[in-house]
């Protein structure tokens, strides 16, 4: 998926950042490196949720929350204005990729084996049941092979950005 793409940008931890933490600066740096942020979504390890919900952009003696809880059932929570979803496949907090910002419109998926199906009356015969099996093989990868360097900048952009390990 997005974590295994060759051009993935890894945002480094801040100087003095504690291990296993996510800070405001990580989020801002990820946002600034994501190509096509308007189509991006955040994926995070469920263990990161308490930290994400407490992120605040400091303004004077106060601040503005970066996390916005969903106001309606079935709508996603938002982080910095984009949908945020827990993902069981994101590594644990502090490991590289525990928070991923991805523009999935730049991700290709294709099937290389058609859907196959089968059924059997033998597997659960004593229960008077019939079983079904469906198999499909597919693969996916990012359209991009490498990060983009804009014409008037040295900062690279890519559709997938993660935080590097924080130890």
What are these regions (language model features)?
Residues 1-167:
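Structured, hydrophobic secondary-structure cores that serve as assembly/anchoring elements
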């Amino acid at each position: 998926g997005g974590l295994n793409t060759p051009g993935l940008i890894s945002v480094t931890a801040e100087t003095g950042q504690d291990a296993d933490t996510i800070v405001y600066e990580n989020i801002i740096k990820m946002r600034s490196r994501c190509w096509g942020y308007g189509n991006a979504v955040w994926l995070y390890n469920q263990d990161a949720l308490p930290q994400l919900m407490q992120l605040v952009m400091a303004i004077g003696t106060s601040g503005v929350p970066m996390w916005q809880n969903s106001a309606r059932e079935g709508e996603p929570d938002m982080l910095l204005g984009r949908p945020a979803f827990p993902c069981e496949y994101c590594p644990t907090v502090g490991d590289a990729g525990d928070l991923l910002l991805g523009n999935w419109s730049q991700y290709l998926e294709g099937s290389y084996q058609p859907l196959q199906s089968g059924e059997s009356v033998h597997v659960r015969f004593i229960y008077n049941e019939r079983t079904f099996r469906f198999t499909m093989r597919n693969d996916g990868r990012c359209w991009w092979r490498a990060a983009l360097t804009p014409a008037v900048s040295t900062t690279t952009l890519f559709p997938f950005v993660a935080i590097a390990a924080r130890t």
